[in-house]
Amino acid sequence: MKNIRNFSIIAHIDHGKSTLSDRIIQICGGLSDREMEAQVLDSMDLERERGITIKAQSVTLDYKASDGETYQLNFIDTPGHVDFSYEVSRSLAACEGALLVVDAGQGVEAQTLANCYTAMEMDLEVVPVLNKIDLPAADPERVAEEIEDIVGIDATDAVRCSAKTGVGVQDVLERLVRDIPPPEGDPEGPLQALIIDSWFDNYLGVVSLIRIKNGTLRKGDKVKVMSTGQTYNADRLGIFTPKQVDRTELKCGEVGWLVCAIKDIHGAPVGDTLTLARNPAEKALPGFKKVKPQVYAGLFPVSSDDYEAFRDALGKLSLNDASLFYEPESSSALGFGFRCGFLGLLHMEIIQERLEREYDLDLITTAPTVVYEVETTSREVIYVDSPSKLPAVNNIYELREPIAECHMLLPQAYLGNVITLCVEKRGVQTNMVYHGNQVALTYEIPMAEVVLDFFDRLKSTSRGYASLDYNFKRFQASDMVRVDVLINGERVDALALITHRDNSQNRGRELVEKMKDLIPRQQFDIAIQAAIGTHIIARSTVKQLRKNVLAKCYGGDISRKKKLLQKQKEGKKRMKQIGNVELPQEAFLAILHVGKDNK
Protein backbone atom coordinates (compact mmCIF):
# COMPACT_ATOMS: atom_id res chain seq x y z
CA MET A 1 0.00 0.00 0.00
CA LYS A 2 2.85 2.41 0.67
CA ASN A 3 3.53 2.48 -3.08
CA ILE A 4 0.05 3.58 -4.12
CA ARG A 5 -0.58 7.24 -4.93
CA ASN A 6 -4.11 8.49 -5.57
CA PHE A 7 -4.35 11.99 -6.98
CA SER A 8 -6.44 14.12 -9.26
CA ILE A 9 -5.58 17.01 -11.53
CA ILE A 10 -7.42 20.26 -10.90
CA ALA A 11 -7.17 23.50 -12.85
CA HIS A 12 -9.10 26.30 -14.52
CA ILE A 13 -10.56 25.67 -17.99
CA ASP A 14 -7.83 25.38 -20.66
CA HIS A 15 -4.85 25.35 -18.35
CA GLY A 16 -3.76 22.01 -19.74
CA LYS A 17 -5.14 19.30 -17.44
CA SER A 18 -6.02 16.84 -20.18
CA THR A 19 -2.74 17.37 -22.05
CA LEU A 20 -0.76 16.79 -18.88
CA SER A 21 -2.64 13.57 -18.25
CA ASP A 22 -1.83 12.47 -21.82
CA ARG A 23 1.88 12.97 -21.13
CA ILE A 24 1.72 11.09 -17.83
CA ILE A 25 0.02 8.15 -19.55
CA GLN A 26 2.69 8.20 -22.24
CA ILE A 27 5.63 8.26 -19.82
CA CYS A 28 4.20 5.42 -17.74
CA GLY A 29 3.50 3.38 -20.87
CA GLY A 30 -0.25 3.10 -20.37
CA LEU A 31 -0.78 3.11 -24.12
CA SER A 32 1.48 2.27 -27.03
CA ASP A 33 2.47 5.19 -29.27
CA ARG A 34 0.09 3.90 -31.92
CA GLU A 35 -2.94 4.17 -29.63
CA MET A 36 -1.93 7.54 -28.27
CA GLU A 37 -4.06 10.47 -29.36
CA ALA A 38 -4.63 13.96 -28.01
CA GLN A 39 -6.91 14.09 -24.96
CA VAL A 40 -7.11 10.33 -24.56
CA LEU A 41 -9.35 10.67 -21.54
CA ASP A 42 -12.00 12.86 -23.14
CA SER A 43 -13.89 9.92 -24.53
CA MET A 44 -17.17 11.62 -25.46
CA ASP A 45 -17.32 13.12 -28.96
CA LEU A 46 -18.89 16.15 -27.38
CA GLU A 47 -15.87 16.63 -25.11
CA ARG A 48 -13.45 16.45 -28.00
CA GLU A 49 -15.43 18.89 -30.14
CA ARG A 50 -15.79 21.54 -27.48
CA GLY A 51 -12.32 20.87 -26.10
CA ILE A 52 -13.63 20.61 -22.56
CA THR A 53 -13.68 17.78 -20.05
CA ILE A 54 -17.17 16.94 -18.83
CA LYS A 55 -16.82 13.61 -17.05
CA ALA A 56 -14.03 12.78 -14.65
CA GLN A 57 -12.00 9.78 -15.91
CA SER A 58 -9.72 7.52 -13.95
CA VAL A 59 -6.50 5.75 -14.96
CA THR A 60 -4.16 3.36 -13.18
CA LEU A 61 -0.49 3.45 -14.20
CA ASP A 62 2.78 1.99 -12.97
CA TYR A 63 5.67 4.38 -12.61
CA LYS A 64 9.26 3.40 -11.88
CA ALA A 65 10.64 6.26 -9.83
CA SER A 66 14.26 7.37 -9.54
CA ASP A 67 14.52 5.70 -6.11
CA GLY A 68 14.14 2.34 -7.83
CA GLU A 69 10.66 1.63 -6.46
CA THR A 70 7.66 1.05 -8.72
CA TYR A 71 4.63 3.09 -7.73
CA GLN A 72 1.03 2.52 -8.69
CA LEU A 73 -0.52 5.85 -9.69
CA ASN A 74 -4.30 6.10 -9.72
CA PHE A 75 -5.25 9.43 -11.15
CA ILE A 76 -8.44 11.15 -12.06
CA ASP A 77 -8.69 13.85 -14.72
CA THR A 78 -11.35 16.36 -13.67
CA PRO A 79 -13.39 19.02 -15.51
CA GLY A 80 -12.51 22.69 -15.04
CA HIS A 81 -15.87 24.26 -15.80
CA VAL A 82 -17.88 25.83 -12.99
CA ASP A 83 -20.99 23.84 -13.99
CA PHE A 84 -19.17 20.59 -13.37
CA SER A 85 -17.53 21.46 -10.07
CA TYR A 86 -19.46 18.63 -8.36
CA GLU A 87 -17.52 16.19 -10.57
CA VAL A 88 -14.34 17.66 -9.12
CA SER A 89 -15.46 17.28 -5.51
CA ARG A 90 -16.45 13.65 -6.15
CA SER A 91 -13.07 12.88 -7.68
CA LEU A 92 -11.22 14.56 -4.82
CA ALA A 93 -13.05 12.38 -2.28
CA ALA A 94 -11.21 9.39 -3.75
CA CYS A 95 -7.73 10.94 -3.54
CA GLU A 96 -5.03 11.87 -1.05
CA GLY A 97 -3.55 14.63 -3.15
CA ALA A 98 -4.13 16.94 -6.07
CA LEU A 99 -1.99 18.52 -8.76
CA LEU A 100 -2.94 22.16 -9.07
CA VAL A 101 -2.11 23.02 -12.68
CA VAL A 102 -1.69 26.73 -13.42
CA ASP A 103 -0.99 28.20 -16.85
CA ALA A 104 2.31 30.10 -16.58
CA GLY A 105 0.99 32.72 -19.02
CA GLN A 106 -2.54 33.25 -17.69
CA GLY A 107 -1.86 32.91 -13.98
CA VAL A 108 -4.38 32.12 -11.29
CA GLU A 109 -8.06 32.22 -12.32
CA ALA A 110 -11.32 31.84 -10.43
CA GLN A 111 -11.73 28.10 -10.91
CA THR A 112 -8.16 27.48 -9.84
CA LEU A 113 -9.11 29.05 -6.54
CA ALA A 114 -12.46 27.34 -6.15
CA ASN A 115 -11.11 23.86 -6.89
CA CYS A 116 -8.07 24.41 -4.73
CA TYR A 117 -10.19 25.39 -1.75
CA THR A 118 -12.36 22.31 -2.29
CA ALA A 119 -9.20 20.19 -2.13
CA MET A 120 -7.95 21.96 0.99
CA GLU A 121 -11.29 21.49 2.75
CA MET A 122 -10.88 17.76 2.19
CA ASP A 123 -7.37 17.88 3.70
CA LEU A 124 -5.60 16.90 0.49
CA GLU A 125 -1.97 17.63 -0.25
CA VAL A 126 -1.94 20.23 -3.04
CA VAL A 127 1.10 20.18 -5.36
CA PRO A 128 1.34 23.30 -7.56
CA VAL A 129 2.52 22.79 -11.17
CA LEU A 130 3.30 25.61 -13.60
CA ASN A 131 2.33 24.44 -17.07
CA LYS A 132 2.97 25.89 -20.56
CA ILE A 133 6.44 27.26 -19.77
CA ASP A 134 7.31 26.85 -23.47
CA LEU A 135 5.05 29.79 -24.36
CA PRO A 136 6.74 33.11 -25.08
CA ALA A 137 4.23 34.81 -22.75
CA ALA A 138 5.06 32.52 -19.83
CA ASP A 139 6.25 34.24 -16.68
CA PRO A 140 6.67 31.50 -14.06
CA GLU A 141 8.11 33.84 -11.38
CA ARG A 142 5.11 36.16 -11.49
CA VAL A 143 2.65 33.27 -11.49
CA ALA A 144 4.40 31.54 -8.58
CA GLU A 145 4.01 34.77 -6.62
CA GLU A 146 0.37 34.97 -7.65
CA ILE A 147 -0.25 31.44 -6.38
CA GLU A 148 1.23 32.34 -3.00
CA ASP A 149 -0.55 35.68 -2.91
CA ILE A 150 -4.04 34.64 -3.99
CA VAL A 151 -4.29 30.92 -3.21
CA GLY A 152 -1.97 30.97 -0.22
CA ILE A 153 0.12 27.83 -0.83
CA ASP A 154 3.89 27.80 -1.04
CA ALA A 155 4.91 27.81 -4.70
CA THR A 156 8.59 28.77 -4.51
CA ASP A 157 9.68 25.34 -5.72
CA ALA A 158 6.61 24.63 -7.87
CA VAL A 159 7.41 22.17 -10.66
CA ARG A 160 7.71 23.84 -14.06
CA CYS A 161 6.73 21.84 -17.07
CA SER A 162 5.26 22.01 -20.52
CA ALA A 163 2.74 19.26 -21.09
CA LYS A 164 2.71 19.90 -24.82
CA THR A 165 6.44 19.36 -25.38
CA GLY A 166 6.86 16.97 -22.44
CA VAL A 167 9.53 19.06 -20.69
CA GLY A 168 9.51 18.62 -16.93
CA VAL A 169 6.68 16.07 -16.79
CA GLN A 170 9.10 13.54 -15.28
CA ASP A 171 9.77 16.02 -12.45
CA VAL A 172 6.03 16.32 -11.87
CA LEU A 173 5.84 12.56 -11.33
CA GLU A 174 8.85 12.55 -9.00
CA ARG A 175 7.34 15.37 -6.96
CA LEU A 176 4.04 13.50 -6.83
CA VAL A 177 5.58 10.34 -5.48
CA ARG A 178 7.50 12.36 -2.91
CA ASP A 179 4.84 14.77 -1.67
CA ILE A 180 1.51 12.99 -1.89
CA PRO A 181 0.91 10.61 1.05
CA PRO A 182 0.04 6.94 0.46
CA PRO A 183 -3.57 5.89 1.18
CA GLU A 184 -4.56 4.96 4.72
CA GLY A 185 -6.86 2.07 5.47
CA ASP A 186 -6.98 -1.43 6.88
CA PRO A 187 -6.44 -4.14 4.21
CA GLU A 188 -7.67 -6.80 6.65
CA GLY A 189 -10.77 -4.92 7.85
CA PRO A 190 -14.32 -5.26 6.50
CA LEU A 191 -14.70 -3.93 2.97
CA GLN A 192 -15.68 -0.31 2.44
CA ALA A 193 -15.67 0.92 -1.16
CA LEU A 194 -16.85 4.36 -2.26
CA ILE A 195 -18.74 4.60 -5.56
CA ILE A 196 -17.20 7.61 -7.32
CA ASP A 197 -19.11 7.36 -10.56
CA SER A 198 -21.43 5.00 -12.44
CA TRP A 199 -22.51 4.67 -16.03
CA PHE A 200 -24.71 2.37 -18.03
CA ASP A 201 -23.37 -0.13 -20.51
CA ASN A 202 -25.91 -1.80 -22.80
CA TYR A 203 -24.24 -5.20 -22.42
CA LEU A 204 -22.89 -5.18 -18.87
CA GLY A 205 -25.55 -3.16 -17.06
CA VAL A 206 -24.28 -0.67 -14.50
CA VAL A 207 -20.50 -0.15 -14.38
CA SER A 208 -19.22 1.60 -11.25
CA LEU A 209 -15.94 3.35 -10.60
CA ILE A 210 -14.95 2.59 -7.01
CA ARG A 211 -12.21 3.47 -4.54
CA ILE A 212 -11.44 0.81 -1.92
CA LYS A 213 -11.02 2.55 1.45
CA ASN A 214 -10.73 -0.56 3.68
CA GLY A 215 -10.53 -4.30 3.03
CA THR A 216 -10.14 -6.12 -0.30
CA LEU A 217 -12.65 -6.88 -3.03
CA ARG A 218 -12.24 -10.16 -4.94
CA LYS A 219 -13.95 -11.41 -8.07
CA GLY A 220 -17.05 -13.45 -7.21
CA ASP A 221 -17.61 -11.80 -3.80
CA LYS A 222 -21.17 -11.01 -2.77
CA VAL A 223 -21.34 -7.24 -2.27
CA LYS A 224 -24.01 -5.22 -0.54
CA VAL A 225 -25.01 -1.64 -1.38
CA MET A 226 -25.31 0.05 2.01
CA SER A 227 -28.08 2.55 1.28
CA THR A 228 -30.46 0.06 -0.35
CA GLY A 229 -29.33 -3.13 1.40
CA GLN A 230 -29.39 -5.02 -1.91
CA THR A 231 -26.76 -7.68 -2.60
CA TYR A 232 -25.08 -8.42 -5.93
CA ASN A 233 -22.35 -10.67 -7.26
CA ALA A 234 -19.06 -9.01 -8.19
CA ASP A 235 -18.90 -10.55 -11.69
CA ARG A 236 -15.99 -8.61 -13.13
CA LEU A 237 -13.64 -6.02 -11.76
CA GLY A 238 -10.47 -4.34 -12.88
CA ILE A 239 -8.69 -1.11 -13.65
CA PHE A 240 -8.45 1.38 -16.48
CA THR A 241 -5.07 1.77 -18.07
CA PRO A 242 -7.08 3.84 -20.06
CA LYS A 243 -8.28 0.52 -21.56
CA GLN A 244 -10.51 -1.67 -19.39
CA VAL A 245 -8.33 -4.44 -17.94
CA ASP A 246 -9.75 -7.30 -15.86
CA ARG A 247 -8.20 -8.13 -12.47
CA THR A 248 -9.04 -10.80 -9.91
CA GLU A 249 -9.00 -8.43 -6.94
CA LEU A 250 -8.86 -4.77 -5.97
CA LYS A 251 -6.76 -4.08 -2.89
CA CYS A 252 -7.13 -1.47 -0.19
CA GLY A 253 -6.33 2.01 -1.53
CA GLU A 254 -6.87 1.15 -5.21
CA VAL A 255 -9.28 2.73 -7.66
CA GLY A 256 -10.97 0.46 -10.19
CA TRP A 257 -14.19 -0.53 -11.91
CA LEU A 258 -16.78 -3.09 -10.94
CA VAL A 259 -19.58 -4.83 -12.84
CA CYS A 260 -22.30 -6.58 -10.82
CA ALA A 261 -24.88 -7.12 -13.57
CA ILE A 262 -27.14 -4.51 -11.99
CA LYS A 263 -29.93 -3.86 -14.44
CA ASP A 264 -31.80 -1.24 -12.40
CA ILE A 265 -30.14 2.09 -13.03
CA HIS A 266 -30.68 3.21 -9.43
CA GLY A 267 -29.05 0.07 -8.04
CA ALA A 268 -25.70 1.67 -7.26
CA PRO A 269 -26.08 5.38 -6.53
CA VAL A 270 -23.00 7.57 -6.75
CA GLY A 271 -21.55 8.41 -3.33
CA ASP A 272 -22.80 5.16 -1.83
CA THR A 273 -20.69 2.58 0.02
CA LEU A 274 -20.25 -1.06 -1.01
CA THR A 275 -19.39 -3.72 1.55
CA LEU A 276 -19.27 -7.53 1.69
CA ALA A 277 -22.54 -9.31 2.42
CA ARG A 278 -20.89 -11.90 4.70
CA ASN A 279 -18.81 -9.42 6.70
CA PRO A 280 -20.46 -6.00 6.38
CA ALA A 281 -18.85 -2.77 7.58
CA GLU A 282 -20.59 -1.08 10.48
CA LYS A 283 -21.18 2.28 8.89
CA ALA A 284 -21.15 3.80 5.44
CA LEU A 285 -18.42 6.18 4.30
CA PRO A 286 -19.36 9.85 4.30
CA GLY A 287 -20.66 10.34 0.76
CA PHE A 288 -20.93 13.58 -1.17
CA LYS A 289 -23.24 16.42 -0.41
CA LYS A 290 -26.12 16.27 -2.83
CA VAL A 291 -25.82 19.06 -5.38
CA LYS A 292 -28.97 21.06 -5.83
CA PRO A 293 -29.87 21.97 -9.40
CA GLN A 294 -29.75 25.73 -9.96
CA VAL A 295 -31.56 25.95 -13.29
CA TYR A 296 -34.75 24.22 -14.36
CA ALA A 297 -36.14 23.82 -17.84
CA GLY A 298 -38.82 21.73 -19.46
CA LEU A 299 -37.66 19.22 -22.07
CA PHE A 300 -40.28 17.85 -24.46
CA PRO A 301 -39.91 15.35 -27.30
CA VAL A 302 -40.96 16.87 -30.64
CA SER A 303 -43.09 13.83 -31.44
CA SER A 304 -45.08 12.33 -28.58
CA ASP A 305 -44.18 8.79 -29.72
CA ASP A 306 -40.65 9.36 -28.42
CA TYR A 307 -41.83 9.85 -24.83
CA GLU A 308 -40.91 6.33 -23.63
CA ALA A 309 -37.50 6.41 -25.31
CA PHE A 310 -36.92 9.85 -23.80
CA ARG A 311 -37.76 8.57 -20.31
CA ASP A 312 -35.29 5.66 -20.62
CA ALA A 313 -32.59 7.95 -21.98
CA LEU A 314 -32.99 10.36 -19.05
CA GLY A 315 -32.77 7.45 -16.63
CA LYS A 316 -29.50 6.23 -18.14
CA LEU A 317 -28.02 9.72 -18.25
CA SER A 318 -28.98 10.51 -14.66
CA LEU A 319 -27.05 7.43 -13.55
CA ASN A 320 -23.93 8.83 -15.18
CA ASP A 321 -24.65 12.36 -14.05
CA ALA A 322 -25.60 12.46 -10.39
CA SER A 323 -26.69 16.08 -10.50
CA LEU A 324 -29.37 15.73 -13.16
CA PHE A 325 -32.85 15.92 -11.67
CA TYR A 326 -36.06 15.21 -13.57
CA GLU A 327 -39.79 14.77 -13.01
CA PRO A 328 -42.66 14.31 -15.48
CA GLU A 329 -44.48 17.44 -16.62
CA SER A 330 -47.25 18.09 -19.09
CA SER A 331 -47.92 21.27 -21.00
CA SER A 332 -51.01 22.17 -22.98
CA ALA A 333 -48.82 23.51 -25.78
CA LEU A 334 -46.10 20.87 -25.91
CA GLY A 335 -47.68 17.66 -24.59
CA PHE A 336 -45.84 15.33 -22.20
CA GLY A 337 -42.22 15.81 -21.22
CA PHE A 338 -39.98 16.28 -18.21
CA ARG A 339 -39.01 19.15 -15.94
CA CYS A 340 -35.25 18.82 -15.58
CA GLY A 341 -32.88 20.44 -13.12
CA PHE A 342 -29.34 21.40 -14.15
CA LEU A 343 -26.31 23.00 -12.53
CA GLY A 344 -26.01 25.78 -15.08
CA LEU A 345 -26.63 26.66 -18.70
CA LEU A 346 -23.59 24.81 -20.03
CA HIS A 347 -24.74 21.69 -18.21
CA MET A 348 -28.20 22.10 -19.73
CA GLU A 349 -26.75 22.46 -23.24
CA ILE A 350 -24.52 19.43 -22.78
CA ILE A 351 -27.35 17.24 -21.47
CA GLN A 352 -29.63 18.27 -24.32
CA GLU A 353 -26.90 17.60 -26.86
CA ARG A 354 -26.07 14.22 -25.32
CA LEU A 355 -29.73 13.22 -25.41
CA GLU A 356 -30.00 14.22 -29.05
CA ARG A 357 -26.77 12.49 -30.07
CA GLU A 358 -26.46 9.41 -27.93
CA TYR A 359 -30.16 8.56 -27.88
CA ASP A 360 -31.23 10.07 -31.19
CA LEU A 361 -34.06 12.24 -29.84
CA ASP A 362 -35.53 15.53 -31.09
CA LEU A 363 -36.24 17.85 -28.19
CA ILE A 364 -37.81 21.23 -27.49
CA THR A 365 -36.50 23.17 -24.48
CA THR A 366 -38.51 25.77 -22.62
CA ALA A 367 -36.91 28.85 -21.06
CA PRO A 368 -34.65 28.09 -18.11
CA THR A 369 -35.82 29.34 -14.71
CA VAL A 370 -34.32 29.20 -11.24
CA VAL A 371 -36.07 28.02 -8.07
CA TYR A 372 -38.09 30.66 -6.26
CA GLU A 373 -39.23 30.45 -2.66
CA VAL A 374 -42.84 31.59 -2.33
CA GLU A 375 -44.65 32.30 0.92
CA THR A 376 -48.39 32.13 0.33
CA THR A 377 -50.97 34.21 2.17
CA SER A 378 -51.70 31.12 4.31
CA ARG A 379 -48.02 31.34 5.45
CA GLU A 380 -47.05 28.13 3.67
CA VAL A 381 -43.63 28.08 1.99
CA ILE A 382 -43.42 26.42 -1.42
CA TYR A 383 -40.60 26.14 -3.94
CA VAL A 384 -41.44 27.01 -7.52
CA ASP A 385 -39.24 25.83 -10.39
CA SER A 386 -41.52 26.69 -13.28
CA PRO A 387 -43.62 29.76 -14.10
CA SER A 388 -46.75 27.62 -14.48
CA LYS A 389 -46.49 26.50 -10.84
CA LEU A 390 -46.48 30.06 -9.51
CA PRO A 391 -49.65 30.70 -7.44
CA ALA A 392 -52.05 33.51 -8.38
CA VAL A 393 -50.80 37.00 -7.53
CA ASN A 394 -53.39 37.55 -4.77
CA ASN A 395 -52.27 34.34 -3.00
CA ILE A 396 -48.62 35.35 -2.75
CA TYR A 397 -47.52 37.01 0.47
CA GLU A 398 -43.84 37.21 -0.47
CA LEU A 399 -41.70 35.93 -3.33
CA ARG A 400 -38.00 35.33 -2.67
CA GLU A 401 -35.43 34.79 -5.38
CA PRO A 402 -32.12 32.92 -5.01
CA ILE A 403 -29.02 35.09 -4.68
CA ALA A 404 -25.67 33.79 -5.93
CA GLU A 405 -22.34 34.82 -4.50
CA CYS A 406 -20.06 35.43 -7.48
CA HIS A 407 -16.30 35.52 -7.17
CA MET A 408 -14.57 37.11 -10.14
CA LEU A 409 -10.88 37.48 -10.91
CA LEU A 410 -9.94 39.99 -13.59
CA PRO A 411 -7.19 42.38 -14.70
CA GLN A 412 -7.59 45.94 -13.36
CA ALA A 413 -8.04 47.37 -16.85
CA TYR A 414 -11.50 45.80 -17.16
CA LEU A 415 -12.74 46.64 -13.66
CA GLY A 416 -15.04 49.47 -14.80
CA ASN A 417 -16.78 47.40 -17.49
CA VAL A 418 -17.33 44.48 -15.15
CA ILE A 419 -18.75 46.65 -12.36
CA THR A 420 -21.16 48.25 -14.87
CA LEU A 421 -22.27 44.78 -15.95
CA CYS A 422 -22.79 43.62 -12.35
CA VAL A 423 -24.87 46.69 -11.53
CA GLU A 424 -26.99 46.13 -14.64
CA LYS A 425 -27.59 42.59 -13.39
CA ARG A 426 -28.87 44.00 -10.05
CA GLY A 427 -25.68 43.00 -8.24
CA VAL A 428 -24.46 44.23 -4.86
CA GLN A 429 -20.72 44.47 -4.25
CA THR A 430 -19.55 42.77 -1.05
CA ASN A 431 -15.79 42.69 -1.45
CA MET A 432 -12.92 43.89 -3.62
CA VAL A 433 -9.25 43.00 -3.17
CA TYR A 434 -6.27 43.96 -5.32
CA HIS A 435 -3.53 41.35 -5.96
CA GLY A 436 -0.79 42.92 -8.06
CA ASN A 437 -2.58 43.89 -11.26
CA GLN A 438 -5.41 41.41 -10.68
CA VAL A 439 -8.60 42.31 -8.85
CA ALA A 440 -10.72 39.83 -6.91
CA LEU A 441 -14.34 41.01 -6.92
CA THR A 442 -17.18 39.51 -4.92
CA TYR A 443 -20.75 40.37 -5.84
CA GLU A 444 -24.14 39.10 -4.78
CA ILE A 445 -26.16 38.77 -7.97
CA PRO A 446 -29.62 37.19 -8.40
CA MET A 447 -29.21 33.63 -9.67
CA ALA A 448 -31.70 34.27 -12.46
CA GLU A 449 -29.39 36.91 -13.93
CA VAL A 450 -26.29 34.74 -13.51
CA VAL A 451 -27.69 31.72 -15.32
CA LEU A 452 -29.20 33.74 -18.16
CA ASP A 453 -26.14 35.11 -19.94
CA PHE A 454 -23.92 36.59 -17.25
CA PHE A 455 -20.95 34.35 -18.04
CA ASP A 456 -20.96 35.19 -21.76
CA ARG A 457 -21.32 38.90 -21.10
CA LEU A 458 -18.58 38.84 -18.47
CA LYS A 459 -16.22 37.19 -20.95
CA SER A 460 -17.03 39.69 -23.70
CA THR A 461 -16.73 42.83 -21.55
CA SER A 462 -13.33 41.68 -20.28
CA ARG A 463 -12.06 40.24 -23.59
CA GLY A 464 -12.05 36.78 -22.05
CA TYR A 465 -9.74 37.65 -19.17
CA ALA A 466 -12.26 37.63 -16.33
CA SER A 467 -13.09 34.32 -14.73
CA LEU A 468 -16.10 33.46 -12.62
CA ASP A 469 -17.03 31.07 -9.85
CA TYR A 470 -20.44 31.20 -8.19
CA ASN A 471 -22.43 29.41 -5.54
CA PHE A 472 -25.90 29.71 -4.04
CA LYS A 473 -26.00 32.02 -1.01
CA ARG A 474 -29.57 32.55 0.17
CA PHE A 475 -33.14 33.47 -0.76
CA GLN A 476 -34.06 37.14 -0.65
CA ALA A 477 -37.43 38.87 -1.00
CA SER A 478 -37.78 40.52 -4.38
CA ASP A 479 -40.42 42.07 -6.60
CA MET A 480 -40.72 39.34 -9.23
CA VAL A 481 -43.66 38.99 -11.61
CA ARG A 482 -44.80 36.37 -14.06
CA VAL A 483 -45.08 37.54 -17.65
CA ASP A 484 -47.54 35.46 -19.68
CA VAL A 485 -47.73 35.36 -23.44
CA LEU A 486 -51.20 35.32 -24.96
CA ILE A 487 -51.75 34.35 -28.55
CA ASN A 488 -55.20 35.38 -29.77
CA GLY A 489 -56.25 35.70 -26.15
CA GLU A 490 -55.05 32.24 -25.10
CA ARG A 491 -52.22 31.77 -22.63
CA VAL A 492 -49.33 29.64 -23.87
CA ASP A 493 -47.91 28.04 -20.73
CA ALA A 494 -44.58 27.11 -22.28
CA LEU A 495 -43.75 30.75 -23.03
CA ALA A 496 -44.32 32.23 -19.56
CA LEU A 497 -41.33 33.66 -17.74
CA ILE A 498 -40.61 35.05 -14.28
CA THR A 499 -38.73 38.33 -14.22
CA HIS A 500 -38.14 41.39 -12.05
CA ARG A 501 -40.87 44.02 -12.23
CA ASP A 502 -38.38 46.68 -13.39
CA ASN A 503 -37.39 44.60 -16.43
CA SER A 504 -40.84 43.21 -17.13
CA GLN A 505 -41.90 45.89 -19.64
CA ASN A 506 -38.73 45.49 -21.69
CA ARG A 507 -38.66 41.70 -21.52
CA GLY A 508 -42.34 41.54 -22.47
CA ARG A 509 -41.92 43.91 -25.41
CA GLU A 510 -38.84 42.12 -26.70
CA LEU A 511 -40.47 38.73 -26.45
CA VAL A 512 -43.56 39.89 -28.30
CA GLU A 513 -41.48 41.47 -31.09
CA LYS A 514 -39.39 38.30 -31.41
CA MET A 515 -42.50 36.12 -31.59
CA LYS A 516 -43.96 38.40 -34.26
CA ASP A 517 -40.99 37.66 -36.53
CA LEU A 518 -41.16 33.94 -35.91
CA ILE A 519 -44.85 33.08 -36.21
CA PRO A 520 -45.75 32.56 -39.87
CA ARG A 521 -48.60 34.68 -41.25
CA GLN A 522 -51.99 33.00 -41.38
CA GLN A 523 -55.29 33.76 -43.08
CA PHE A 524 -56.33 35.90 -40.11
CA ASP A 525 -54.71 38.43 -37.73
CA ILE A 526 -52.78 36.94 -34.81
CA ALA A 527 -52.58 39.12 -31.70
CA ILE A 528 -49.53 38.43 -29.55
CA GLN A 529 -49.72 39.98 -26.10
CA ALA A 530 -47.54 39.96 -23.00
CA ALA A 531 -49.43 40.27 -19.73
CA ILE A 532 -48.78 40.46 -16.01
CA GLY A 533 -51.91 38.97 -14.47
CA THR A 534 -54.70 40.72 -16.39
CA HIS A 535 -52.65 43.81 -17.18
CA ILE A 536 -51.40 43.81 -20.80
CA ILE A 537 -47.91 45.30 -21.06
CA ALA A 538 -47.07 44.77 -24.74
CA ARG A 539 -48.78 43.76 -27.94
CA SER A 540 -48.02 43.24 -31.58
CA THR A 541 -49.97 41.76 -34.46
CA VAL A 542 -48.97 39.32 -37.16
CA LYS A 543 -50.92 40.67 -40.13
CA GLN A 544 -53.18 38.35 -42.08
CA LEU A 545 -52.57 37.21 -45.60
CA ARG A 546 -55.45 38.44 -47.75
CA LYS A 547 -56.55 37.95 -51.29
CA ASN A 548 -57.18 41.09 -53.33
CA VAL A 549 -60.94 40.67 -53.81
CA LEU A 550 -61.21 43.96 -55.74
CA ALA A 551 -58.94 42.81 -58.56
CA LYS A 552 -61.88 41.89 -60.79
CA CYS A 553 -63.78 45.19 -60.32
CA TYR A 554 -62.72 47.62 -63.04
CA GLY A 555 -63.64 51.21 -62.13
CA GLY A 556 -66.88 49.86 -60.77
CA ASP A 557 -69.30 51.06 -58.18
CA ILE A 558 -68.11 51.80 -54.63
CA SER A 559 -70.99 49.87 -53.11
CA ARG A 560 -69.93 46.78 -55.07
CA LYS A 561 -66.40 47.06 -53.64
CA LYS A 562 -67.74 47.58 -50.14
CA LYS A 563 -69.89 44.49 -50.44
CA LEU A 564 -66.92 42.32 -51.47
CA LEU A 565 -64.68 43.71 -48.72
CA GLN A 566 -67.43 43.21 -46.14
CA LYS A 567 -67.89 39.63 -47.27
CA GLN A 568 -64.15 38.98 -46.96
CA LYS A 569 -64.10 40.55 -43.51
CA GLU A 570 -66.87 38.27 -42.27
CA GLY A 571 -65.11 35.23 -43.63
CA LYS A 572 -61.88 36.23 -41.84
CA LYS A 573 -63.80 36.79 -38.62
CA ARG A 574 -65.31 33.32 -38.83
CA MET A 575 -61.89 31.83 -39.55
CA LYS A 576 -60.39 33.58 -36.57
CA GLN A 577 -62.96 32.03 -34.24
CA ILE A 578 -62.12 28.48 -35.22
CA GLY A 579 -58.55 28.85 -36.50
CA ASN A 580 -55.57 27.45 -34.61
CA VAL A 581 -52.13 29.01 -34.61
CA GLU A 582 -49.25 26.58 -35.14
CA LEU A 583 -46.20 27.72 -33.20
CA PRO A 584 -42.88 26.76 -34.77
CA GLN A 585 -40.07 25.32 -32.62
CA GLU A 586 -38.08 28.58 -33.05
CA ALA A 587 -40.77 30.46 -31.17
CA PHE A 588 -40.04 28.48 -28.02
CA LEU A 589 -36.32 29.05 -28.44
CA ALA A 590 -36.85 32.80 -28.91
CA ILE A 591 -37.53 33.11 -25.23
CA LEU A 592 -34.02 31.83 -24.48
CA HIS A 593 -32.49 34.71 -26.38
CA VAL A 594 -34.59 37.56 -25.08
CA GLY A 595 -32.31 40.40 -24.07
CA LYS A 596 -29.26 39.10 -25.92
CA ASP A 597 -29.26 40.78 -29.32
CA ASN A 598 -29.78 44.35 -28.23
CA LYS A 599 -26.57 44.65 -26.24
UniProtKB/Swiss-Prot annotation:
SUPFAM superfamilies: EF-G C-terminal domain-like (SSF54980), P-loop containing nucleoside triphosphate hydrolases (SSF52540). Keywords: Cell inner membrane, Cell membrane, GTP-binding, Hydrolase, Membrane, Nucleotide-binding, Protein biosynthesis. GO terms for cellular component: cytosol; plasma membrane. One of its GO terms (molecular function) is identical protein binding. Residues 2-184 form the tr-type G domain. Its EC number is 3.6.5.n1. Pfam families: EFG_C, GTP_EFTU, GTP_EFTU_D2, LepA_C. It catalyses: GTP + H2O = GDP + phosphate + H(+). GTP binds at D14, H15, G16, K17, S18, T19, N131, K132, I133, D134. It is a peripheral membrane protein. The keyword Iron-sulfur does not apply. It is found in: Cell inner membrane. HAMAP family: LepA (MF_00071). Required for accurate and efficient protein synthesis under certain stress conditions. May act as a fidelity factor of the translation reaction, by catalyzing a one-codon backward translocation of tRNAs on improperly translocated ribosomes. Back-translocation proceeds from a post-translocation (POST) complex to a pre-translocation (PRE) complex, thus giving elongation factor G a second chance to translocate the tRNAs correctly. Binds to ribosomes in a GTP-dependent manner. Belongs to the TRAFAC class translation factor GTPase superfamily. Classic translation factor GTPase family. LepA subfamily. This is Elongation factor 4. It comes from Escherichia coli (strain K12).
